[in-house]
Amino acid sequence: MTIWVAAAIAFSIQAGGSRNLAEDPAVAKAVEAVRRIEAATIDEQVRLCEIPAPPFKERTRAEAYRQALEQLGLQDVRFDAVGNVIGVRPGASATPNVVLSAHLDTVFPEETDVRVKRTGARISGPGIGDNCRGLAVVLAVVRALNEAGVRTPGTLTIVATVGEEGLGDLRGVKHLFDRELQGRVDAFVSVDGAGHMITHGAVGSRRYRITFKGPGGHSFGAFGTPNPAHALGRAIARFADLKVPAEPRTTFNVGRIGGGTSVNAIPFEAWMEVDLRSVDPAALAALDAAFHKVLDAALADEHARWGRGGLELDRRNVGNRPAGRVPPSAPIVSAAVKASEAVGLPVGLDESSTDANYPISLGIPALTIEGGGRGEAAHALDEWFDPTDSWKGTARALLLAVVLAR
């Protein structure tokens, strides 16, 4: 018996698994299989990375993933109404139903060169870690369970989601819990990116496109007409002066601004896109309320400056990711910690915005784990992945899925 076989069995006992699971040599064989097939897992990671999956256009990569799930023998493999890919690995019982998931989309536009480069052990390419690593890990977990003949007491539902990034606003995972699998998920694990961290804090966000609109006019001839760009500037200045708590961490950002047609024309409109974040729902709500007061004040200031009205303020919500937190003492977090220890991964807990946000907000046991290895420059064209001992991330995901499905 190797050290990894012993670790798998010890983990099953420590995590509170049934005695039959703890004594099942197939679980240990599955961990060994993960290590043996890691080179193939990395090849799959590269293959998926070279299939573009820009925001709202994930279908080509999703089709490749659907085919992979069918080849692994999953049942009821399908697309749902929003484009998520779903397959079922039945257990001895329909419950507990554990979702093991990874997101399909990247932040990169359609024209991005997604060819992957290998330099020594390092692999680089846009999306190679976030989230082609997660997608490949989920497939490897299923493959290793199949090779070892593991039949979990509960069911594993495998999902590749759309819309995790940016203005996708978690549309895939929201549909999953609101429609496709509503009321039928007992635990949710998302695999996202490279590394070893366990994300148990859901950083919530509210995102807006704010537009000030007015009649416009010539910069000289119509001088004195309330100016949308000036109102926008007043709003940004007031917004930048807001005080937010350091704990719970709460942040804000003006990410994009625009408007106007010419240097010598009063704009018809000026706009900004804004991101508000906090891990605490109450802090996020307070920041949101303060932001809207800033907008009202900026509009009033611009009207008062010229002694007349004429501007309109359009507030469009373009993103709403709920905040929340799973306590470190929660069984699902404890199981993830023990799985990390069992395979020799460092234990680290953090907070982020991931697909797990939504089930956490619904009170469903959920978290996100990174997929092993090491990587940097996520969301950049020169993103890279170092596969040294990356199999440990897959092994952790496997152990966690098996124990949750007990």
Where do the PLM segments sit?
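Acidic/histidine-rich catalytic neighborhood of metal-dependent amide-processing enzymes
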Residues: 122, 127-205, 244-245, 264, ...
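Glycine/charged-rich beta-loop-alpha catalytic/anionic-binding loops adjacent to active sites
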Residues: 114-125, 213-217, 378-381
